[in-house]
Amino acid sequence: GFSGCPGSGPGDKKPNWVTCAWPPDYLEILDWQWNEVVLPYWSKMNTELGDAGVKFAFEMHPGFVVYNTDTMLRVRRECGDNIGANFDPSHLFWQGMEPVECVKALKGCIYHVHAKDSIVHQTNAAVNGVNDYKSYGDEINRSWIFRTCGYGHDLKWWNDFFSTLRMVGYDGAISI
């Protein structure tokens, strides 16, 4: 599932995904989102999940407040361990993260895994960066695209990924 992304203040009906710390207005938005909406909501949900014997896994996905390792660890630390990660490396690659290192950092809180690949088209990214809003139907012009496993990263990378998952104790499903 996804963490959601509140607006920039009470009454806003559209999400506001903050991606930078300047100007200071953005930090105020983040403070409001996390302290007034995200943490209270997911703390309550964590309790309800526990009462029901359910674990909930966030897919760390750009556009939502939980989109990287740091935000995943924060929501878990502040809300509880009925919340964990649905680990999908495809969203991390194009953000410039190394998913194998993220798996190590998330040891003990990975509840599900997607085997999905992506690739950054360096020539497009060199001109436009990776926060790309172009349609997925316009792959030739996008800075990054989703790929079948092995068509973005090689077999050695995938072997290292699955081995690292096992090393940190993950023994669950892999969804393709």
Locations of regions flagged by a protein language model:
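Histidine-acidic metal/acid-base catalytic patches
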Residues: 43-47, 51, 65-176
